[in-house]
Each structure stands twice: as structure tokens, then as C-alpha cells.
Amino acid sequence: MDVVILAAGLGTRMKSSKPKVLHRILEKPIIDYVIDCAKSLNPFNSFVVINPSLKEVAEHLEKYNIKIVFQDEPKGTAHALLSALPYLSSDKILILNGDTPLLRKETLDSFIELFNKNGLDMALLSFYPQREHSYGRILRDGEQKIKKIVEITDFKDELMLSSEANSGIYILKREVAELVKEIKQNPNKGEFYLTDIVEIAVNKGFNIEAYPLAEENELIGINTRAELSLAMRYLRDRIVKGWMEKGITFYDPALVWISPSVTIGQDTIIYPNVFLEGDTKIGQNCLICQGVRIKNSIIEDNVQINDCTVIENSHIKSASKIGPFAHLRPDSIIGKGCRIGNFVEVKNSTIGDGTKAAHLSYIGDSEIGNNVNIGAGTITCNYDGQKKHKTIIEDNVFIGSDTQLVAPVKICKGAYIGAGSTITKEVPEDSLAISRTPQKNILGWAKKKRKQ
């Protein structure tokens, strides 16, 4: 079986400089969903038909082992298939649309099985719409045999005769596909409609059937920003439902966004307004609170992420507590049982087990050991105006509040840093470092000031 994905439309209704099929749904381009679904069927060949002006699409498709066919002129879906026909080598052809990203492999498996089982020459995937749409309708005769497909723009009166809509997804034999050469130009739009192949094939005695195997939401085609938003919500609902069936609790399923590549462990609880993106992996029995965004990160078991925390390309080990209002920037590793508290920013740093930075700190380009206490207001001064430098803090160090550690610098294990210090040199093991100006009390000064 060959698969042909029709993606030559210019997508003018999207009002965008970006090609329609490259717009993203939960971080993934629309056409990637279709290609991945097609590839899961293990076809003999896969083709994508695009307009030559869509150079961005052609460049995007280079990462796939897929053949590109150019439709030199935008003359409609029939002309798009005609452009691909010389390159097809299989007796069966599955036709998909590049703007229908929610189609599932299970649906196509059933569709292909029915086509083969019933010895058909062509099959259509149909559905019964519940909302207003622009899909053509499938007309049947008194014996419920298919007669033709009528487009909503051309035959509005006839549409009252049928509520069965055409999804634009077909499987057909090569000899039926050849009939695309007989399709006439539509007088209203000047295009060649692939839907007209049905009436031609019926009149020639080919065996054709339509199967309503999918819900309307699965077959949504994206032509506008409103439909893009709708598809995002449908996919979100599908993903969240799947995770609930696997033992995840969502306080409000309609207010979370989870990318398809994310994984979540059992008994994790997720609050509203949470975004889990990229290749994020959440362990078991975690708590993800309101307003959290996690991207391309590993969160191990029993971790608590408190409100309004952002985590990017980082690794948090088990039983740690992060936030609220914390920011873990890329390449940060947080050890087991750590506490990274409110308004703490960590960047490109490794923090050992049991270490606490509870308030108002910046930790950048640092290597921090186990059981370290980092006082409120501590800053690793890692940038000298030209390049970044490393701070090393060994095990069991106590850093007092409002400390500046001017990198490169090392604090050896067991050392104490007095509050308000600026540390520029190595601090030896088990010693106290303090660099603040000695306190001076001027007796009676305030009383004199008030009398002035």
C-alpha cells in the first residue's frame, strides 16, 4: 500500500506567513501528526504532495524518509493526486489530508481491514457532524448504495438528503485512482475535485462503500486559527483522558496542557493551569501545583513542584520540593530531598542531596555538595562581563544570608560563611569566613538628628 498525503493548500485563511501544516498543536507541527500516523501503518511508500512555493514545508520534510511531490499549479485535490500518480507503485492507495492531525492509527487499521475484508474497489471514511462545517456530503440511493459526494458550496439543496459527511480520507485501488484523469474542472471554483471520482467510479460499476468509523473531533481539518485552537483542545482532552485512565488525578482536566511525548507516573496529582511540554517525564506520586510549566525535564518520584514554578531541561531527583516561584533553567540537576524555595533561580548547576536554598537566591554555573544550607539572598557572581566562572561548594557548608560568592571560588566542606559576606577567595575546610565591615555604633546620633 502507498500513502499519499495531500498538503498543497496554501492555507490563506490562517492569515499567516507560515505554511498552514507547519503550525503547531502542543508543540508538534500539524503535518507531523499525519506523517507519524501514516508511518505507523508500514506502507510500501509514503508521499506528500505540496505546492512548490512551500519551501519551508519541503525543508521540514527532509527529516522524514518520505517522498515529496510538487503540485505545480493549485488546481484542487484531484490534480494533487494526479501529480503523485506517476510515482505510485502499489495496487492500493491510502489518501490522507495534511491538515487532519487527530486521526488515529486504530481508526485507519479498522478502515483498511473493512476495505480488504469486503473486497472493495474504494472506501471512504465518513462521519456524522454535530456542528456546522464545510465538508461534502455522501449521497446514497434507495438501497443505501453510494451515488456520489456533493460539495457544500455547490449543491446546498441536495445536502438536506444526507447527514453523512465525507472526511476526505480514502483507500482505493490503482485502477480507480486512474479515473482521476476523467474528472472535469468545477465551473464555480475552476478546480478539479477529488470527490468527483466517486460518481465516475460508481457509474463504471466499481464497488464503493463509506464507513463512519470516527467521531467528528478526530477528523477535524484545520483551515483557520479557530479550528487550530479547537484541535488543540480535542487533543488535550484525549491526552488527559488517557492519563486519568492510567491513574493520574487532574483537579480540572480542561485547564492543563500536556504534550503527546510527556510521560506521567501513577498517583501523581496535577493542579489547573499546568503546562507539561517536550520530553518531560514525571515520576510516581508527584504533586504539580498551579501555574507550573515544565519542559524537557525529568521529575523523579515523590517530588512536589509548588505554584508558579518554571523548569526547563533539568533533572529533579526524588522527594525534593521546588518553589513556589522558582526557576530552574537548562542543565540544572537537583539532588534527592532538596528544597529549592520561592524566588530561587538555578542555572547550569548541580545541587547535591539534602541541600536547601529556601529563599531569594541565584545559583549559576555551580557545583554544590550534599546537605548545604544556602541562606536567603545568596548570589553566585558567575559573570565577569566577558565569560562565566564556576562556584564550588562542598558538603555540609553553611552559607549565611546575603552572601556574594565571586566566581571562580571554592568553599571547602564543613565551612561557614557569615551573613553579608563577599567571598572572593577559597574558604578552607571547617573554617569561618566573614568579610563584612565591622559594625560601628554612634551613641545619641538618632536623638540629635530628630532635634534638627
UniProtKB/Swiss-Prot annotation:
The keyword Acetylation does not apply. GO terms for molecular function: glucosamine-1-phosphate N-acetyltransferase activity; magnesium ion binding; UDP-N-acetylglucosamine diphosphorylase activity. Residues 1-225 are annotated as: Pyrophosphorylase. CDD domains: GT2_GlmU_N_bac (cd02540), LbH_GlmU_C (cd03353). Mg(2+) binds at D99, N223. Residues 247-452 are annotated as: N-acetyltransferase. The active site is at H359. InterPro entries: Bifunctional_GlmU, GlmU-like, GlmU_C_LbH, Hexapep, MobA-like_NTP_Trfase, Nucleotide-diphossugar_trans, Trimer_LpxA-like_sf. Its EC number is 2.7.7.23, 2.3.1.157. UDP-N-acetyl-alpha-D-glucosamine binds at residues 6-9, 20, 71, 76-77, 136, 151, 166, 223, 329, 347, 362, 373. Binds 1 Mg(2+) ion per subunit. Its cofactor is Mg(2+). Acetyl-CoA binds at A376, N382, Y383, S401, A419, R436. Pathway: Nucleotide-sugar biosynthesis; UDP-N-acetyl-alpha-D-glucosamine biosynthesis; N-acetyl-alpha-D-glucosamine 1-phosphate from alpha-D-glucosamine 6-phosphate (route II): step 2/2; Nucleotide-sugar biosynthesis; UDP-N-acetyl-alpha-D-glucosamine biosynthesis; UDP-N-acetyl-alpha-D-glucosamine from N-acetyl-alpha-D-glucosamine 1-phosphate: step 1/1; Bacterial outer membrane biogenesis; LPS lipid A biosynthesis. It is found in: Cytoplasm. GO terms for biological process: cell morphogenesis; cell wall organization; lipid A biosynthetic process; peptidoglycan biosynthetic process; regulation of cell shape; UDP-N-acetylglucosamine biosynthetic process. Residues 226-246 are annotated as: Linker. Catalyzes the last two sequential reactions in the de novo biosynthetic pathway for UDP-N-acetylglucosamine (UDP-GlcNAc). The C-terminal domain catalyzes the transfer of acetyl group from acetyl coenzyme A to glucosamine-1-phosphate (GlcN-1-P) to produce N-acetylglucosamine-1-phosphate (GlcNAc-1-P), which is converted into UDP-GlcNAc by the transfer of uridine 5-monophosphate (from uridine 5-triphosphate), a reaction catalyzed by the N-terminal domain. In the N-terminal section; belongs to the N-acetylglucosamine-1-phosphate uridyltransferase family. In the C-terminal section; belongs to the transferase hexapeptide repeat family. HAMAP family: GlmU. Homotrimer. This is Bifunctional protein GlmU. It comes from Thermodesulfovibrio yellowstonii (strain ATCC 51303 / DSM 11347 / YP87). The gene is glmU.
